[in-house]
Amino acid sequence: RCRVHLYRLCRVAEAEGILLVMESLRDDESNLVYDLPRAREMYRQIGHPNLKMMVDNIATGAAGETLEDWFNAFGDDLIHMHFLDGDPWLHNVWGDGNTSLSRQLQIMQAHHFTGYLVQEVADEHYFTDPFSADRRNFRVLERFLED
């Protein structure tokens, strides 16, 4: 049923001139698409040019996968990313987890990634002072930005 509805949504997206992006979740969040093999199979079965992929590096870490695995699977159809520092379960600001920011950026550069990066800082320990968390996050990211 999910595939049928996703395909229908893709046809509407095509008529509207937009793309849909599918995200893989963790296995405690979904029973449909929670790892690379299931994402690849759903993507293949939908088979519509208006369906693209996104990667959440928290979900990939929890599944024991890498960003490289996802680029190898989807190539240029990987256009969006929840880009966080995981442990791998928490949605941390950069510097609070154990994900290598420099390695993630190297992989994106090697694959000429020009898609969107979203900071989905959603762990509850940031809720009391989100401004401070954002400030710390951007200070870490600034070290990797070019003028």
For the regions a language model picked out, list residue spans one by one:
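Histidine-acidic metal/acid-base catalytic patches
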Residues: V33-K52, G61-D147
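Active-site acidic/histidine proton-transfer and metal-coordination neighborhood
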Residues: R1-K52, A62
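Generic enzyme active-site microenvironment
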Residues: V21-M22, M54-N57, V118
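Short, contiguous strand/loop micro-motifs
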Residues: R26-E29, N57, L90-N92
